[in-house]
Amino acid sequence: MRSDTIKQGIERTPHRALIKGTGVPQSEMAKPFIGVATSFTDLIPGHVGMRDLERFIEKGIHSGGGYAFFFGIPGVCDGIAMGHKGMHYSLPTRELIADMVESVAEAHRLDGLVLLTNCDKITPGMLMAAARLDIPTIVVTAGPMMAGRGVEGRRFSFVTDTFEAMARYKAGVIDAKELQVCEDNACPGMGSCQGLFTANTMAILTETLGMSLPRCGTALAVSALKRRIAFASGEKIVDLVRNGVTPRQILTRAAFENAIRVDLALGGSSNTVLHLLAIAREAGVDLPLETFDILSKETPQIASMNPAGEYFMEDLDAAGGVVGVLKQLGGTIKDSPTVLGLTTRELASTVESVDERVIRPVSDPVKKEGGIAVLFGNLAPKGAVVKQSGVSAPMMQFEGTARCFDSEELAMAALMGGKITSGDVVVIRYEGPKGGPGMREMLAPTATLMGLGLGDSVALVTDGRFSGGTRGPCIGHISPEAAEGGPIALVEEGDRIRLDIPNRKLELLVDESILAERRSRWVAPEPKIKTGWLARYAKVVTSAYTGAVTTAE
C-alpha cells in the first residue's frame, strides 16, 4: 500500500508517532488509509448537508476495512460570487482545488480518496485531481436541492426566480411583493440549485464517467438514498484500493464521449466544455473542442430541463436518473468501466423502465441535435460555445448591430438603463481567462436580457462564460480572447455581427483590410488585477478552447 511509505520500518517511527497523535490505535495502522476530501462549508446551500454525508462515508470506510481521514477543500458559490469581484475567483478555484487534493494525498501517501463535492468548480477540480493522481478514487456529489414550492403547485428555481425575476421587476412585469415571494422560495434548503445548471450537470457527468455510484448524480440532497450512496461509496473505495482500480482505468476516451453525449442529450451547462477538456487533459486523453460539435450533430436532446425547459432534477431522478438516460441513448453509448464494477452498458441493461415524459426516446426527441454547439468564424477562429438548447427558434440565425462593452458591469448598466434594444448584439469582452482574469460568468446580463423580454431580439457574445442557468442567444468562450488580441477585441460600436447556429458560424461582417488596420493600432489594456494570486493565474492560464487550464509551459 502507498501508506506503507509512512507506516512501515524503523525509520518511520516519527511518522507513526504523529499518526498515533491523532488518535489512531495500533490495531488500525495496517488498514488502507483513505482520505476524505470534504468541501463542507455553511456558506453554500449545496454544501451545508455535507457534515451528515461525512459520517456515512466514514462509516462505510470502516465497514469496508479502511481507516478514514478528513481534510478540507474550499468551495465558492457561483451564485453568491456572481456580478462582482468575487466571480473572478470562481473558475481559478478549480485549479486550486486540484492542486490541494494532489498536495494532501501525495504528502501523506494516502491509499485512496473519497471526494465529497457538489457545486460548480469544486467537482471538476476534484476530478482533475483524481485523474492527475491516479490512485483509487470515488466521488460523492452531495445532491440537488428540491424545487421551491408555492401556492397552487407553483415550483420555484434559483435562476428563473431570482436573476430573471429581478429583471422582470425592473421592467414592471411583477411587483415588489412578488419579487419577495420569489426570493423567499427560490432556495428552500440544502442542495445544488434545482435545474440542470453547472453543479448538477457535473454531478450527472461524474456518474456517467464512471467515477460515482449509480443514482449519485441525481439523488436529492435531503434523501435517505443520498446517505446510503455515501455509505456505499465509503465501502467501495476500500474495495477499489485492494483491487488497484484507479481513475485512468475508468476515464477513457469512451467514458468522455459518453459524458458528452449525456450532456448533449439533457441540454446541460456549457461550462462542462471547459471542465471535460481540463479533466481529459489530466487523464491523458486527447479531447479536442470539435468533439462536442461532432457528437452534438448526432445526439438528440431528449429531456427538457430547467432553466430552458420544464423539468427539475427531482423529476429526472424519479424518471430514471443517469442510467435511464444511458438506456434511452442505447447503442450510441460506448462500453466503459465504472467504480461499481459494472460497465456503462451493463448498468443501462439493469433499467426496467423510464418515465418517457421526462427522458424521451431518441425517436421522439425534444430537439434533433444536442444541447451544445461549437461555432467558428472570423470572430472566433479557435471556437465559441453556445447552449443551443436554450435558444429560441427565431434567434438560431440572427444578424445585429454590435454594442461593445469592456466589462460585465458596463454591459449591465446599459441593460438596466434601457440602452439595449431589439436588433442589438451585446459584445462583452476582456472577460476571458486572462483578461478577466478568471473568465467570469455572465449570468446577470443574460438573465436580465431574458427578464426584459429581449431574448428573441437581442444576442450576446463574450470571451467570458455563462452560468448553467443561462438561457437565450448567448455565445461564450470566444477564442482567442480579447486580452490576447483576438478578433473580439477589434469589434467596434455599430459593426454588424451574424450568428448562424445551424451552420455553426459566428461572423464579424467587417472587411479584412479594416480589421488589419484596427489590429495594427490595438494595444493590450492594463491588467484589471495586478496583485494576489489572480495576477499569477492570468500569466499561466490557457485559452478557453483548451479548457482554461494553468500550465508551466
Curated annotation (Swiss-Prot):
The active site is at S467 (proton acceptor). The modification N6-carboxylysine is found at K121. Homodimer. Transmembrane segments: none annotated. The keyword Chaperone does not apply. The keyword Lipid biosynthesis does not apply. GO terms for cellular component: cytosol. Keywords: 2Fe-2S, Amino-acid biosynthesis, Branched-chain amino acid biosynthesis, Iron, Iron-sulfur, Lyase, Magnesium, Metal-binding. It comes from Geobacter metallireducens (strain ATCC 53774 / DSM 7210 / GS-15). One of its GO terms (biological process) is isoleucine biosynthetic process. Pathway: Amino-acid biosynthesis; L-isoleucine biosynthesis; L-isoleucine from 2-oxobutanoate: step 3/4; Amino-acid biosynthesis; L-valine biosynthesis; L-valine from pyruvate: step 3/4. It holds the Pfam family ILVD_EDD_N. [2Fe-2S] cluster binds at C119, C193. Its EC number is 4.2.1.9. Its cofactor is [2Fe-2S] cluster; Mg(2+). Binds 1 [2Fe-2S] cluster per subunit. This cluster acts as a Lewis acid cofactor. PROSITE patterns: ILVD_EDD_1, ILVD_EDD_2. Functions in the biosynthesis of branched-chain amino acids. Catalyzes the dehydration of (2R,3R)-2,3-dihydroxy-3-methylpentanoate (2,3-dihydroxy-3-methylvalerate) into 2-oxo-3-methylpentanoate (2-oxo-3-methylvalerate) and of (2R)-2,3-dihydroxy-3-methylbutanoate (2,3-dihydroxyisovalerate) into 2-oxo-3-methylbutanoate (2-oxoisovalerate), the penultimate precursor to L-isoleucine and L-valine, respectively. The gene is ilvD. Mg(2+) binds at D78, D120, K121, E441. This is Dihydroxy-acid dehydratase. Belongs to the IlvD/Edd family.
